[in-house]
Amino acid sequence: DGDTGTNMSMTIMAAANALADSDAQTAGEVAETVASAMLRGARGNSGVILSQFFRGISKGLKGKETCTAKEFADALKMGSDAAYKAVMNPTEGTILTVSKEVAIGAQMKAETSKDIIEVLECAVDRGNITLKRTPEMVPALKQAGVVDAGGQGWMYFLEGALHTLKTGEVIESGMETQAPATEKNQAQKSIDTSSIKYMYCT
């Protein structure tokens, strides 16, 4: 909807550009580079919230050389927690809810699997199930017949990460992605900018 996708994309590109210019080697260093760049380059409400996810993830991976499946799952939980704390009045049925369920899915799978791909697959599955339920949580979404745009953007990001982990290939910008017919349109539930504690820099 509107500019949600553009704002999220620009925020992620800030991190991608920072990594391209960085000599970060460890999981902790990469996470810190990404979080710092996103905090500086966040655009719009969705970008600010996304930057807070990675702020939490960075804290979870701080000082770590590598990242195990469990550490990854726990970092996702810390990311979700950080995003919730950044918003004074969190609204369910938004990207916040989707991120929370993604983290739950990851942590559940990490209890029985040490394979980070399996953990991310479970996280993505749970996230997509939750995304489809967002219209039931937000009347405006149900009335419009759409899912939450921020949540959809987060799922596209995670699906891209999963694709790269499984194939070693990066999805090029501009490539078409296939969404279910019922999700052709998305809408971002409005989150008042004033309710976000950590704003972005311009």
Question: What residue ranges belong to the model's regions?
Answer:
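N-terminal loops that bind phosphate or other acidic moieties
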Residues: 1-202
